[in-house]
Amino acid sequence: MLTLALPKGRLAEETALLLLSKGWLKNLPSEGSKELTYVSEDKRIRLLFVRSQDVCTYVEEAAADVGIVGWDIIREGGFDLIAPVDLKLGACRLSLASFPDFDLFAKRSKVRVATKYPNLTREYFFSKGISCEIIKLYGSIELAPIVGLSDCIVDLVSTGGTLKANGLKEFESILFSTARLVSNRSSFYHKHAELRSLIESLEN
């Protein structure tokens, strides 16, 4: 039996529907259920529902054989995982945003940046040769420049609607992200036949 870690929320629902269409599930988990695990009727697969930020940890530490998680989280965490399949789900981009009159190169002191992605943000500003001060937040990132906490933000953008609603402009995309199937190295070799079957199902 393969154990698959899924992020709670919309991506878990999309993945469950995908697994249903590929024959890995015969029924969907009960809507609104508080259970954190779900085993398929044929015992081929067990689902774990965890926070998106924890999927890679569950997989890397072999608590799950595989997981589905955004490319942004994989890159930010620097996890030692195999990522064999791009599922093309949950497409979004990690972008630099601020007020329309913001000039990244005008400030002579450090640029103050609010983000949930300190490592990718630091890497981006380093590539530009610009010194930055990272302010790590866990939500409502768009609020930071509005209240003067930061000069700009680096955050995930899907449609840009939240930015526009708060008077902010997207300046540059740093990273394009979609959901990926990831595997820990041990499971990839020791459960290769099962994993290959899952991978082929998801790729077709």
Swiss-Prot record:
The lineage of its organism: Bacteria, Pseudomonadati, Spirochaetota, Spirochaetia, Leptospirales. It catalyses: 1-(5-phospho-beta-D-ribosyl)-ATP + diphosphate = 5-phospho-alpha-D-ribose 1-diphosphate + ATP. InterPro entries: ATP_PRibTrfase_cat, ATP_PRibTrfase_CS, ATP_PRibTrfase_HisG, ATP_PRibTrfase_HisG_short. Gene3D superfamilies: Periplasmic binding protein-like II. It comes from Leptospira biflexa serovar Patoc (strain Patoc 1 / ATCC 23582 / Paris). The gene is hisG. One of its GO terms (biological process) is L-histidine biosynthetic process. Pathway: Amino-acid biosynthesis; L-histidine biosynthesis; L-histidine from 5-phospho-alpha-D-ribose 1-diphosphate: step 1/9. This is ATP phosphoribosyltransferase. GO terms for molecular function: ATP binding; ATP phosphoribosyltransferase activity. Its EC number is 2.4.2.17. The keyword Calcium does not apply. GO terms for cellular component: cytoplasm. SUPFAM superfamilies: Periplasmic binding protein-like II. It is found in: Cytoplasm. Belongs to the ATP phosphoribosyltransferase family. Short subfamily. Heteromultimer composed of HisG and HisZ subunits. Pfam families: HisG (PF01634). It is an enzyme of class 2 (transferase). Catalyzes the condensation of ATP and 5-phosphoribose 1-diphosphate to form N'-(5'-phosphoribosyl)-ATP (PR-ATP). Has a crucial role in the pathway because the rate of histidine biosynthesis seems to be controlled primarily by regulation of HisG enzymatic activity. Coiled coil: none annotated.
